[in-house]
Amino acid sequence: VTGGTDIALEVTKKQNDLTNIFYLGSNKDLNFIKIKNHNLHIGAATSINKILPYLEKIYPSFAKMFLRYGSEQIRNVASIGGNLASASPIGDSSPVLIALDSKIIIEGKYKREVLLKNFFRGYRKTLLKNNELIKEIIIPINKKYFLKCYKISKRIDDDISSIFMAISG
């Protein structure tokens, strides 16, 4: 885990006893940001607040959406990798990343690259196998793309989406 916001609900709301939890937030192999070959590469454990300055320059609408994504404290620990791995239907980053044709690197016994649109298998179900994790998110940087994100929620900030839409082209 990095932020652990979804996992915490497993304990507090469902009373699940989680025996093996590993903190990945300080793992340097999962905590990085770099631009290479017209792509933004983000380590899966990189906090949302660390990503914001890059997104503000590349995709301002995406950055603006993240400013409504939880409190400052949550954005300091929450990660896109965690948001994707939980496969929550209310995850705000998934529609944007899919609209941008993003990919993820999954690592376990083997390493594989997967288009994000093929990663989700159903409600809280993904392609991840036992002993695999999301290592990296790859977002294409295309100056010809336009991106608009729209989030509707009961409260303006720090609330789950009732409706979320991302359009790119």
Q: Residue ranges of each PLM-predicted region?
A:
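C-terminal structural segment of proteins
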Residues: 1-169
